Amino acid sequence: MNKNLIITILLPFLGTTLGSACVFIMRNELKVNTRKILAGFAAGVMVAASIWSLLIPAIEQSEKMGKLSFIPAFAGFWIGTLFLLLLDKVVPHTHIDSTDEGPSTTLKKTTKLVLAVTLHNIPEGMAVGVVCAGWLRNNGAINMLGALALSIGIAIQNFPEGAIVSMPLKSEGMSKKKAFVMGTLSGVVEPVAAVITVLAAGVLIPVLPYLLSFAAGAMLYVVVDELIPEMTEGSDHSNMGTIFFAVGFTLMMVLDVALG
Protein backbone atom coordinates (compact mmCIF):
# COMPACT_ATOMS: atom_id res chain seq x y z
CA MET A 1 0.00 0.00 0.00
CA ASN A 2 1.27 3.49 -0.79
CA LYS A 3 1.38 6.30 1.75
CA ASN A 4 -1.57 8.26 0.33
CA LEU A 5 -3.78 5.17 0.33
CA ILE A 6 -2.97 4.38 3.97
CA ILE A 7 -3.74 7.96 5.02
CA THR A 8 -7.02 7.96 3.09
CA ILE A 9 -8.13 4.68 4.68
CA LEU A 10 -7.14 5.65 8.25
CA LEU A 11 -8.49 9.23 8.35
CA PRO A 12 -12.11 8.23 9.20
CA PHE A 13 -10.86 6.05 12.07
CA LEU A 14 -8.81 8.98 13.37
CA GLY A 15 -11.99 11.08 13.37
CA THR A 16 -13.80 8.49 15.50
CA THR A 17 -10.84 8.25 17.89
CA LEU A 18 -10.63 12.01 18.40
CA GLY A 19 -14.39 12.23 18.93
CA SER A 20 -14.27 9.44 21.51
CA ALA A 21 -11.58 11.40 23.36
CA CYS A 22 -14.23 14.01 24.25
CA VAL A 23 -14.86 11.98 27.42
CA PHE A 24 -11.61 13.41 28.79
CA ILE A 25 -12.51 17.07 28.22
CA MET A 26 -16.32 17.20 28.52
CA ARG A 27 -17.83 16.83 31.97
CA ASN A 28 -21.50 16.26 31.33
CA GLU A 29 -23.63 14.08 29.07
CA LEU A 30 -24.42 15.56 25.67
CA LYS A 31 -27.55 17.72 25.74
CA VAL A 32 -30.46 16.88 23.43
CA ASN A 33 -29.86 19.99 21.33
CA THR A 34 -26.18 19.11 20.99
CA ARG A 35 -27.06 15.60 19.84
CA LYS A 36 -29.45 17.10 17.26
CA ILE A 37 -26.68 19.33 15.93
CA LEU A 38 -24.17 16.47 15.72
CA ALA A 39 -26.66 14.09 14.10
CA GLY A 40 -27.77 16.73 11.60
CA PHE A 41 -24.20 17.55 10.64
CA ALA A 42 -23.29 13.87 10.20
CA ALA A 43 -26.42 13.28 8.11
CA GLY A 44 -25.60 16.21 5.83
CA VAL A 45 -22.06 14.96 5.20
CA MET A 46 -23.26 11.43 4.45
CA VAL A 47 -26.02 12.52 2.05
CA ALA A 48 -23.63 14.77 0.10
CA ALA A 49 -20.95 12.07 0.03
CA SER A 50 -23.49 9.54 -1.24
CA ILE A 51 -24.48 11.82 -4.11
CA TRP A 52 -21.22 13.48 -5.26
CA SER A 53 -18.68 10.82 -4.32
CA LEU A 54 -20.67 7.64 -4.99
CA LEU A 55 -23.87 7.86 -7.05
CA ILE A 56 -22.72 10.39 -9.66
CA PRO A 57 -19.42 8.51 -10.32
CA ALA A 58 -21.41 5.25 -10.54
CA ILE A 59 -23.59 6.75 -13.29
CA GLU A 60 -20.61 8.36 -15.06
CA GLN A 61 -18.77 5.05 -15.17
CA SER A 62 -21.79 3.42 -16.84
CA GLU A 63 -22.22 6.06 -19.55
CA LYS A 64 -21.40 3.49 -22.27
CA MET A 65 -24.82 1.99 -21.52
CA GLY A 66 -26.45 5.13 -22.89
CA LYS A 67 -29.96 5.74 -21.59
CA LEU A 68 -29.62 2.64 -19.39
CA SER A 69 -26.60 4.04 -17.52
CA PHE A 70 -28.78 4.41 -14.42
CA ILE A 71 -29.16 0.64 -14.01
CA PRO A 72 -25.92 -0.09 -12.05
CA ALA A 73 -26.61 2.86 -9.72
CA PHE A 74 -30.25 1.81 -9.29
CA ALA A 75 -29.46 -1.85 -8.63
CA GLY A 76 -26.46 -1.24 -6.37
CA PHE A 77 -28.38 1.36 -4.35
CA TRP A 78 -31.21 -1.07 -3.62
CA ILE A 79 -28.84 -3.93 -2.78
CA GLY A 80 -26.97 -1.68 -0.32
CA THR A 81 -30.21 -0.54 1.31
CA LEU A 82 -31.54 -4.09 1.68
CA PHE A 83 -28.17 -5.31 2.99
CA LEU A 84 -28.24 -2.79 5.87
CA LEU A 85 -31.89 -3.62 6.52
CA LEU A 86 -30.91 -7.29 6.83
CA LEU A 87 -28.04 -6.51 9.21
CA ASP A 88 -30.39 -4.41 11.33
CA LYS A 89 -32.68 -7.43 11.69
CA VAL A 90 -30.06 -10.11 12.45
CA VAL A 91 -27.54 -8.20 14.63
CA PRO A 92 -28.73 -7.30 18.17
CA HIS A 93 -28.04 -3.63 18.89
CA THR A 94 -29.29 -0.59 20.79
CA HIS A 95 -29.80 2.82 19.20
CA ILE A 96 -28.70 6.08 20.85
CA ASP A 97 -32.30 6.65 22.00
CA SER A 98 -32.12 3.27 23.86
CA THR A 99 -34.42 1.52 21.38
CA ASP A 100 -33.46 -2.15 20.95
CA GLU A 101 -33.43 -3.77 17.52
CA GLY A 102 -32.58 -7.24 16.26
CA PRO A 103 -32.99 -10.63 18.01
CA SER A 104 -33.26 -10.91 21.79
CA THR A 105 -29.93 -11.29 23.55
CA THR A 106 -28.27 -11.18 26.97
CA LEU A 107 -25.63 -8.71 25.79
CA LYS A 108 -25.16 -5.59 27.92
CA LYS A 109 -26.75 -2.34 26.76
CA THR A 110 -23.33 -0.73 26.30
CA THR A 111 -22.18 -3.60 24.08
CA LYS A 112 -25.32 -3.32 21.95
CA LEU A 113 -24.83 0.45 21.63
CA VAL A 114 -21.30 -0.06 20.31
CA LEU A 115 -22.62 -2.79 17.99
CA ALA A 116 -25.16 -0.33 16.56
CA VAL A 117 -22.53 2.26 15.68
CA THR A 118 -20.14 -0.43 14.42
CA LEU A 119 -22.90 -1.78 12.19
CA HIS A 120 -23.56 1.64 10.71
CA ASN A 121 -19.84 2.33 10.21
CA ILE A 122 -19.52 -0.56 7.75
CA PRO A 123 -20.94 1.33 4.74
CA GLU A 124 -18.71 4.32 5.48
CA GLY A 125 -15.64 2.09 5.38
CA MET A 126 -16.92 0.48 2.18
CA ALA A 127 -17.46 3.91 0.64
CA VAL A 128 -13.84 4.91 1.28
CA GLY A 129 -12.64 1.53 0.02
CA VAL A 130 -14.57 1.64 -3.22
CA VAL A 131 -13.47 5.18 -4.17
CA CYS A 132 -9.88 4.20 -3.36
CA ALA A 133 -10.29 1.20 -5.65
CA GLY A 134 -11.53 3.47 -8.43
CA TRP A 135 -8.57 5.79 -7.92
CA LEU A 136 -6.02 2.93 -7.88
CA ARG A 137 -7.48 1.48 -11.07
CA ASN A 138 -6.94 4.85 -12.82
CA ASN A 139 -10.67 5.27 -13.14
CA GLY A 140 -11.49 8.49 -14.97
CA ALA A 141 -14.39 9.41 -12.66
CA ILE A 142 -12.35 9.14 -9.43
CA ASN A 143 -8.89 10.49 -8.62
CA MET A 144 -6.72 10.55 -5.51
CA LEU A 145 -8.02 13.96 -4.37
CA GLY A 146 -11.61 12.80 -4.82
CA ALA A 147 -10.95 9.77 -2.62
CA LEU A 148 -9.22 12.00 -0.06
CA ALA A 149 -12.17 14.42 -0.07
CA LEU A 150 -14.57 11.61 0.81
CA SER A 151 -12.22 10.34 3.51
CA ILE A 152 -11.88 13.82 5.07
CA GLY A 153 -15.64 14.32 4.98
CA ILE A 154 -16.32 11.01 6.72
CA ALA A 155 -13.55 11.72 9.26
CA ILE A 156 -15.18 15.07 10.09
CA GLN A 157 -18.60 13.50 10.63
CA ASN A 158 -17.01 10.64 12.61
CA PHE A 159 -15.77 13.12 15.22
CA PRO A 160 -19.25 13.84 16.62
CA GLU A 161 -20.17 10.18 16.10
CA GLY A 162 -17.31 9.12 18.38
CA ALA A 163 -18.53 11.56 21.04
CA ILE A 164 -22.11 10.33 20.67
CA VAL A 165 -20.89 6.82 21.58
CA SER A 166 -18.38 7.55 24.35
CA MET A 167 -20.24 10.29 26.25
CA PRO A 168 -23.39 8.24 27.05
CA LEU A 169 -21.18 5.33 28.15
CA LYS A 170 -19.39 7.63 30.60
CA SER A 171 -22.67 9.04 31.89
CA GLU A 172 -23.86 5.49 32.64
CA GLY A 173 -20.93 4.95 35.00
CA MET A 174 -18.23 3.57 32.71
CA SER A 175 -14.74 4.92 33.36
CA LYS A 176 -13.43 7.57 30.97
CA LYS A 177 -10.69 5.28 29.67
CA LYS A 178 -13.07 2.40 28.99
CA ALA A 179 -15.66 4.69 27.37
CA PHE A 180 -12.89 6.06 25.14
CA VAL A 181 -11.77 2.57 24.16
CA MET A 182 -15.33 1.44 23.41
CA GLY A 183 -15.96 4.53 21.29
CA THR A 184 -12.71 3.99 19.42
CA LEU A 185 -13.45 0.30 18.83
CA SER A 186 -16.73 1.23 17.15
CA GLY A 187 -14.66 2.81 14.39
CA VAL A 188 -12.19 -0.05 13.86
CA VAL A 189 -14.56 -1.65 11.37
CA GLU A 190 -14.14 1.28 8.94
CA PRO A 191 -10.50 0.70 7.87
CA VAL A 192 -11.15 -3.05 7.89
CA ALA A 193 -14.16 -2.65 5.59
CA ALA A 194 -12.18 -0.23 3.41
CA VAL A 195 -9.27 -2.65 2.91
CA ILE A 196 -11.60 -5.59 2.17
CA THR A 197 -13.50 -3.47 -0.37
CA VAL A 198 -10.29 -2.32 -2.08
CA LEU A 199 -9.16 -5.93 -2.45
CA ALA A 200 -12.58 -7.12 -3.62
CA ALA A 201 -12.93 -4.29 -6.12
CA GLY A 202 -9.54 -5.22 -7.58
CA VAL A 203 -11.04 -8.55 -8.61
CA LEU A 204 -14.44 -7.13 -9.53
CA ILE A 205 -13.47 -4.05 -11.58
CA PRO A 206 -16.43 -4.40 -14.02
CA VAL A 207 -18.90 -4.06 -11.14
CA LEU A 208 -17.29 -0.96 -9.59
CA PRO A 209 -20.39 1.18 -10.39
CA TYR A 210 -22.50 -1.34 -8.46
CA LEU A 211 -20.12 -1.17 -5.49
CA LEU A 212 -20.19 2.64 -5.48
CA SER A 213 -23.98 2.75 -5.45
CA PHE A 214 -24.12 -0.13 -2.94
CA ALA A 215 -22.13 2.00 -0.48
CA ALA A 216 -24.42 4.97 -1.21
CA GLY A 217 -27.56 2.94 -0.53
CA ALA A 218 -26.13 1.61 2.73
CA MET A 219 -25.03 5.08 3.89
CA LEU A 220 -28.39 6.67 3.13
CA TYR A 221 -30.13 3.85 4.98
CA VAL A 222 -28.15 4.87 8.07
CA VAL A 223 -29.10 8.52 7.56
CA VAL A 224 -32.84 7.81 7.35
CA ASP A 225 -32.96 5.03 9.95
CA GLU A 226 -30.64 6.49 12.58
CA LEU A 227 -29.61 10.11 12.09
CA ILE A 228 -32.80 11.84 10.94
CA PRO A 229 -34.84 10.49 13.91
CA GLU A 230 -32.04 11.61 16.22
CA MET A 231 -31.83 15.13 14.79
CA THR A 232 -35.59 15.55 15.36
CA GLU A 233 -35.88 13.83 18.75
CA GLY A 234 -37.63 15.40 21.74
CA SER A 235 -40.93 17.20 22.22
CA ASP A 236 -39.46 20.70 21.80
CA HIS A 237 -39.27 21.70 18.14
CA SER A 238 -35.83 22.86 17.05
CA ASN A 239 -34.37 23.66 13.65
CA MET A 240 -30.77 23.17 14.79
CA GLY A 241 -30.55 19.65 13.38
CA THR A 242 -31.82 20.86 10.00
CA ILE A 243 -29.47 23.85 9.94
CA PHE A 244 -26.44 21.69 10.68
CA PHE A 245 -27.61 19.15 8.12
CA ALA A 246 -27.21 21.97 5.59
CA VAL A 247 -23.79 22.85 7.05
CA GLY A 248 -22.59 19.25 6.73
CA PHE A 249 -24.07 18.86 3.24
CA THR A 250 -22.47 22.00 1.83
CA LEU A 251 -19.12 21.29 3.53
CA MET A 252 -18.93 17.85 1.92
CA MET A 253 -20.09 19.27 -1.41
CA VAL A 254 -17.33 21.90 -1.34
CA LEU A 255 -14.72 19.30 -0.36
CA ASP A 256 -15.70 16.99 -3.19
CA VAL A 257 -15.87 19.69 -5.87
CA ALA A 258 -12.73 21.52 -4.71
CA LEU A 259 -10.56 18.42 -4.29
CA GLY A 260 -12.23 16.03 -6.73
Language-model segment annotations:
Residues 1-260:
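Intrinsically disordered, metal-sensing/regulatory segments
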